[in-house]
Amino acid sequence: MAGGGETARHYIGTGRKLGMDESMLDDLGLRAARLNAELLVGGLGDAAYPTVPEDMNQVAEAFTTGKVVVVGGFHPGHSTNAVAALIAERVHANLFVNATDVDGVYTSDPNKNPRAKKLDRVTTSQLKKMFGNGQMHAGTYELLDLLAVNIIERSKIRTVILKCDPSAIRKAIQGELIGTLVVV
């Protein structure tokens, strides 16, 4: 699952200055995520499924090919984290890895608070308290949003949140405890 990243934040910020409503801003973010997904497909070459799926049925079909499936979001208003959790649930994945810009879940934003403590394990209930404030604006999703946490909880999928680094992802896939383990 590719997120929109800086590209999305740039377009959303510009759109907000132009007076676009939140649904239009969500759509800009989704388009940026899909554009990033197209770049990833190109970078992966023959290892990747050749197109970016646009709905859950296309994802399920693409997974049957054995190729790497890169997705960039489906619906405005749904974070890429929530869609990624839905995909993990749909394909019955045994591990959901959320690779992000920090190396796990912290007691507060480590980019803003140098005293923030990294948590090795966190429950979905704790995550709901941390990220479930109910406020949602385009391009401002926290580490996880409430919908993503609820999907992780209902599917009981093993979830690890870690730094977006190939060696960290490899370690998580191999079963090494790295980042933060989400406990249902």
Please report, for each region that a protein language model flagged, where it lies by residue:
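C-terminal catalytic "cap/lid" subdomain
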Residues: 2-184
